[in-house]
């Protein structure tokens, strides 16, 4: 039988872990052990086959780190990324990501995780962000869209934002739009999307901010 203390020592540095990672250290690890530890509050289930230790939940970036791990490949984008950068005013409770896998929705103690599907040719425009592990001795990486990609992902995946009035409902930060938006990167990314409808939405958005 796998002992919890040794199990925690091996798996804790991963931040969160899958049952397959657990079995790479402990081939005899059974689901009964995971169920028992979950009931005792020693580990917390994130989705089927994925778990974390409770002390990790206090880390600032942990919810976003989990997003990149429990459904991969994916990167944090859309409303969550825009909120992270301070581009939209409201706090976002749902963690929104983009993936090449099928659209999915998960819920756990950290909140709700939403994944929107894009084709592989549109899976780019993100960067790695480091999260220091609990003991400070190592770091784990999660993936975050650049501001311009998060904005384009939103306009591409949410057809609701199709008129100037609807685009204004996003309440994008004016300082970001007029002073910090990387216009060169935005145009480069827009060309890579190669989508006439998206071009039209971006044109309307830039008009609102007189860009």
What spans do the regions from the language model cover?
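Short beta-edge/loop segments at beta->alpha junctions of small alpha/beta modules
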Residues: 1-73
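Structural motif detector for alpha-helix initiation sites
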Residues: 19, 78, 147-148
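Hydrophobic/aromatic-lined pockets within catalytic cores
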Residues: 27, 86, 156-160
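Short coil/loop linkers at secondary-structure junctions
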Residues: 28-30, 88, 196
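A general structural signal for short secondary-structure junctions and capping/turn motifs
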Residues: 35, 105-107, 141-143
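Short gly/ser-rich loop at a beta-strand->alpha-helix junction or flexible surface loop bordering the NTP-binding
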Residues: 38, 45-53, 63-122
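Internal catalytic-core helix/loop-beta-alpha segment
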Residues: 112-138
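Hydrophobic alpha-helical interaction segments
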Residues: 130-211
């Amino acid at each position: 039988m796998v002992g919890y203390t040794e199990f925690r020592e091996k798996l804790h540095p991963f931040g969160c872990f899958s049952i397959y990672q657990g079995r790479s250290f402990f081939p005899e690890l059974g689901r009964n052990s995971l169920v028992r530890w979950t009931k005792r509050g020693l580990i917390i289930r994130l989705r089927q086959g994925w778990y974390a230790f409770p002390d990790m939940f206090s880390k600032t970036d942990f919810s976003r780190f989990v997003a990149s791990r429990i459904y991969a490949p994916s990167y944090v984008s859309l409303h969550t990324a825009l909120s992270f950068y301070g581009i939209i005013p409201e706090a976002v409770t749902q963690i929104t990501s983009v993936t090449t896998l099928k659209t999915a929705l998960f819920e756990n103690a950290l909140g709700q995780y939403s994944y929107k599907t894009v084709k592989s040719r549109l899976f780019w425009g993100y960067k790695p962000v480091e999260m220091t592990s609990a003991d400070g001795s190592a770091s784990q990486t999660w993936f975050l869209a650049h501001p311009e990609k998060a904005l384009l992902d939103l306009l591409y995946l949410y057809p609701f934002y199709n008129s100037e009035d609807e685009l204004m409902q996003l309440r994008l930060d004016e300082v970001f739009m007029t002073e910090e938006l990387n216009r060169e990167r935005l145009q480069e990314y827009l060309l890579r999307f190669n989508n006439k409808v998206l071009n039209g939405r971006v044109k309307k958005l830039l008009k609102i901010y007189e860009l």
